[in-house]
């Protein structure tokens, strides 16, 4: 359906019997009305044609083959000159066979039936509206007991009792024995009520606005009483207040949507289109049918039996009629939600029947599998791995996925560059994986963003845009800083990749969805691209080192890891001479040559033109030389000054990890400054 804001939407709700008839009924040229399914049959075992008025009837649901009726006659579809549109012999309409995907039928129930979703699901809407315990309502629906009708003026058999106690169930064994079907119906219609018809009467008599006013008044009275001092009573009062709030909200919803509460009790049962519950012929001539068909057959069998008891047989005891009504109620319950009342119904092979609820709910249901989470074109899926060398707005796309996603774009590129004369030649070159194919693929990918999505998509950052680049392997490479927005990590998580095709979608991806434009949380405004997990561990490993500073002297075994520089003094003490480097390039070169470790302490000559934070600490020691120069020794660095107190050089005590970390930060700051200068 389409609402007033032109949004396409699907709305599930209660429907009136008149609307069900409108969906299903058709009037034939001879005046006959079709739409009601009265027979529990599917196909004739000899002709393999649908049975008339059965679950696959062509008169009700449309022809199996487009434009061909059950007699075999053919009419051109959509030709207004050819008349009539219905076959005069079989009554089948000459329309497209796709009508069997949406044309519905209905079953006219011999007795009202309560919709089990609104009775047994929690919270029970029927119990909330009637303000009665669910257990008592179940006993009423399944004919375990009854209640008296309030007759004001006329004398009654039950001696004017305004209600029938639920505990008194002796009527179940005594009253029906004194009446035939006709007599018992007269008595029941006048004085007592049971089954779903009793629920329907009570729902029809409800005044929703009065329910809201009374519930609000009771809620205020409970609020004014305050705590009783008894924990049990306080909990009971709290549960009652919560129930009153739910009851008022439910009544307001019925008023707002203009839906009558008695619609929760069914008089007509809709029959799904046959294409949604097919019967398929498999190898060996065997037939495979949907479980929905068998459940519909069960309902029709029991409903027809009840109809016969009420119309044809005049000597059947009333108790048998009520038992048959209970069987009809249970059959409809099994069709709608098998197993909701306890043990599920099974077939001859001890397999549980798949009811209507099982078809639509869950991960493999109709909505999530074929409507919301269905597979779409121009999409792929793979495991994500970390790409530490990637930019924040880039992602690594495996060649196998990229060539499949951009298949049509590569074909167009091959034809435009006159490398292939037609689509067939272009496809053959792609299958052969010619080198020119990868070059064109890279050109196409440079101007086309992709969308990465990780389920479940709980907020806006669950799907972001990236600039793809080709990588080897079969996993999608991702920058670790964007993982928090996806709530992802690299322990086997999978992501879906989609290609925005239209110009509007590409513009939206570039302007709003790129990862480097979503650095803040849209909910609270805090930074969301922050180091987590692997990055924190990597930063810790990079910056770990000798925390004791220069106080760790040569006799301290803390520095034992520089095995190449170990020395033994006269007292047989092992100590390490810390290496000295004139530049960071020399230190990194020594690390690559495995002369030092990542966290090994070393001395590094610091350039005076580099940024230096002025120290506020007092030197640990000052060493003076004969030429007037002196050394100020601090915890992690050493300053050499001349006679005029001018800094001659600075030596810092650091590690290779800290040097690498500093270089990365310095490059990032320089890149940010260049970007700011370009923008101004």
Swiss-Prot record:
Record-linked InterPro entries: DNA-dir_RpoC_beta_prime, RNA_pol_asu, RNA_pol_N, RNA_pol_Rpb1_1, RNA_pol_Rpb1_3_sf, RNA_pol_Rpb1_clamp_domain, RNApol_RpoC1
Q: Which domain of life is it from?
A: Eukaryota
Say if the entry is tagged with keyword Transcription: yes
GO molecular-function terms, A-Z:
DNA binding; DNA-directed RNA polymerase activity; magnesium ion binding; zinc ion binding
The EC designation for this entry is 2.7.7.6
Q: Which cysteines are joined by disulfide bonds?
A: none
Tell me which residues bind Zn(2+).
69, 71, 87, 90
Assembly and binders:
In plastids the minimal PEP RNA polymerase catalytic core is composed of four subunits: alpha, beta, beta', and beta''. When a (nuclear-encoded) sigma factor is associated with the core the holoenzyme is formed, which can initiate transcription.
Q: Which PANTHER family match?
A: DNA-DIRECTED RNA POLYMERASE, DNA-DIRECTED RNA POLYMERASE SUBUNIT BETA
Q: What is this protein called?
A: DNA-directed RNA polymerase subunit beta'
Instruction: State the organism's lineage.
Output: Eukaryota, Viridiplantae, Streptophyta, Embryophyta, Tracheophyta
Q: What is the primary gene name for this protein?
A: rpoC1
């Amino acid at each position: 359906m389409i609402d007033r804001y032109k949004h396409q939407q699907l709305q599930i709700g209660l429907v009136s019997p008149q609307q069900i008839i409108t969906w299903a009924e058709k009037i034939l040229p001879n005046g006959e009305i079709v739409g009601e399914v009265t027979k529990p049959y599917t196909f004739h075992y000899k002709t393999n044609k649908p049975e008339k008025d059965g679950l696959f009837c062509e008169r009700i649901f449309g022809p199996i083959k487009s434009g061909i009726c059950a007699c075999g006659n053919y009419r051109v579809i959509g030709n207004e000159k050819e008349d009539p549109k219905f076959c005069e012999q079989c009554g089948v309409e000459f329309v497209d066979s796709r009508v069997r995907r949406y044309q519905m039928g209905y079953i006219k129930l011999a007795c009202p039936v309560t919709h089990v979703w609104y009775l047994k699901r929690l919270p029970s809407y029927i119990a909330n509206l009637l303000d009665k315990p669910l257990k008592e309502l179940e006993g009423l629906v399944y004919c375990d007991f009854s209640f008296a009708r309030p007759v004001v003026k006329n004398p009654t058999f039950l001696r004017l009792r305004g209600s029938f106690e639920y505990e008194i169930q002796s009527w179940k064994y005594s009253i029906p024995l004194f009446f035939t079907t006709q007599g018992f119906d007269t008595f029941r219609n006048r004085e007592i009520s049971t089954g779903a018809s009793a629920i329907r009467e009570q729902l029809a008599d409800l005044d929703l606005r009065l329910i809201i006013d009374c519930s609000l008044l009771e809620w205020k009275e409970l609020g004014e009483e305050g705590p009783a001092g008894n924990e049990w009573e306080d909990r009971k009062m709290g549960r009652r207040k919560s129930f009153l709030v739910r009851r008022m909200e439910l009544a307001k919803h019925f008023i707002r949507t203009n839906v009558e509460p008695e619609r929760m009790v069914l008089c007509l049962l809709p029959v799904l289109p046959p294409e949604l519950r097919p019967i398929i012929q498999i190898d060996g001539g065997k037939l495979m049918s949907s479980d929905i068909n068998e459940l519909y057959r069960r309902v029709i069998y029991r409903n027809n039996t009840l109809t016969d008891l009420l119309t044809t047989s005049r000597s059947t005891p009333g108790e048998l009629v009520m038992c048959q009504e209970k069987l009809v109620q249970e059959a409809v319950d099994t069709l709608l939600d098998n197993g909701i009342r306890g043990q599920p119904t099974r077939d001859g092979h001890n397999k549980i029947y798949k009811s209507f609820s099982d078809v639509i709910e869950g991960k493999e249901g109709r909505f999530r599998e074929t409507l919301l989470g269905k597979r779409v074109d121009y999409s792929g899926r793979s495991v994500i791995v970390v790409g530490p060398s990637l930019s924040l707005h880039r992602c690594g796309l495996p060649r196998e996925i990229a060539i499949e996603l951009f298949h049509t774009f590569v074909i167009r590129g091959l034809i435009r560059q006159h490398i292939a004369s037609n689509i067939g030649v272009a496809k053959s070159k792609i299958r052969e994986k010619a080198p020119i194919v990868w070059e064109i693929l890279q050109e196409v990918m440079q101007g086309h963003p992709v969308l990465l999505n990780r389920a479940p998509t709980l907020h806006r950052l669950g799907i972001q845009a990236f600039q793809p680049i080709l990588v080897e392997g079969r996993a999608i490479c991702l920058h670790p800083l964007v993982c928090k927005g996806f709530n992802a990590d690299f322990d086997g998580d999978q992501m879906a990749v989609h290609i925005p095709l239209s110009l509007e979608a590409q513009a939206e991806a570039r302007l709003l969805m790129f990862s480097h434009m979503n650095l803040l949380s849209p909910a609270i405004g805090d930074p969301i691209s922050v180091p987590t997990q692997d990055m924190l561990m990597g930063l810790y490993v990079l910056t770990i080192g000798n925390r004791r500073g220069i106080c760790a002297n040569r006799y301290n075994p803390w520095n034992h890891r520089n095995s190449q520089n170990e020395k033994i003094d006269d007292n047989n003490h092992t100590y390490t001479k810390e290496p000295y480097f004139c530049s960071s390039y020399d230190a990194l070169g020594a690390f690559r040559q495995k002369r030092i470790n990542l966290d090994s302490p070393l001395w590094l000559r610091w350039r005076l033109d580099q940024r230096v934070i002025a120290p506020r600490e007092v030197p640990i020691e000052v060493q003076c030389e004969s030429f007037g120069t002196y050394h100020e020794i601090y915890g992690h660095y050493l300053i050499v000054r001349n006679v005029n107190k001018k800094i001659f050089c600075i030596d810092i005590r650091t590690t290779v990890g800290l040097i690498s970390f500093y270089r990365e930060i310095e490059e990032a700051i320089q890149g940010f400054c260049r970007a700011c200068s370009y923008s101004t």
